[in-house]
């Protein structure tokens, strides 16, 4: 996030349960999960508003890897055995896709409902796994634990690059947060918040009501 020039960034874990049914389409699944995370953090920040001040810009994201041969949504491996099985499945499929949903929120100045502005987007990248990777290399990679906390079980920015033959789309989307898309959402949300501030009471109709009352007198 430092690349986006944000002066102060606080990482706040979301307590939202990632329990949506895997039968959803991948883009539906990631979008619903990212939105759920953003709302959870926003609500938590509202509860501590007196102590910490009004919530700032909230950015939430969720990433899944999809085995395009079966349509299976792959998240983080649950164990070493599932990690090995996941990478072997990706090797057999050869092609898979990475979906990242981003949800950006900012509080509105006015009391207008729902009290915040939100913008969302989904980034999609096609990835080709190297079909010539051996079982031994997969096991050795799993033992490094580099991909244990990553959707799909590998990190393209690290040793996991030896497993990948190529990508079509955003590199940022595979290794983390798609920066260009995220920046665009931030600009839209902040513009909405600024518009709400400029509208103020005039656009709520208060002045017009007062003028009508004066005319009646």
What are these regions (language model features)?
Residues 25-217:
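Anionic-ligand binding patches
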Residues 1-11, 189-192:
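N-terminal G-site helix/loop of the GST-like fold
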Residues 13-22:
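Short, acidic/turn-prone active-site loops that include or flank metal/cofactor-
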């Amino acid at each position: 996030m430092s690349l986006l020039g944000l002066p102060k960034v606080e990482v706040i874990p979301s307590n939202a349960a990632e329990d949506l049914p895997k039968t959803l389409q991948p883009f539906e699944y990631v979008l619903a999960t990212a939105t759920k995370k953003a709302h959870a953090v926003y609500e938590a920040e509202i509860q501590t508003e007196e102590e910490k001040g009004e919530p700032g810009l909230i950015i939430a994201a969720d990433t899944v890897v999809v085995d395009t041969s079966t349509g299976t949504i792959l998240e983080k491996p649950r164990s070493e055995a599932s990690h090995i099985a996941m990478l072997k499945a990706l090797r057999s499929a050869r092609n898979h896709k990475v979906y990242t949903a981003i949800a950006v929120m900012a509080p509105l100045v006015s009391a207008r409902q729902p009290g915040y502005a939100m913008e969302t987007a989904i980034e999609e990248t096609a990835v080709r796994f190297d079909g010539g990777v051996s079982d031994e290399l997969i096991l050795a990679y799993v033992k490094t634990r580099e991909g244990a906390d990553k959707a799909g079980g590998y990190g393209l920015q690290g040793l996991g690059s030896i497993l990948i033959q190529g990508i079509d789309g955003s590199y940022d989307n595979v290794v983390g947060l798609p920066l260009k898309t995220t920046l665009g959402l931030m600009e839209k949300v902040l513009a909405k918040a600024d518009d709400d501030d400029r509208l103020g009471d005039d656009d709520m109709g208060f002045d017009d009501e007062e003028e009508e009352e004066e005319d009646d007198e």
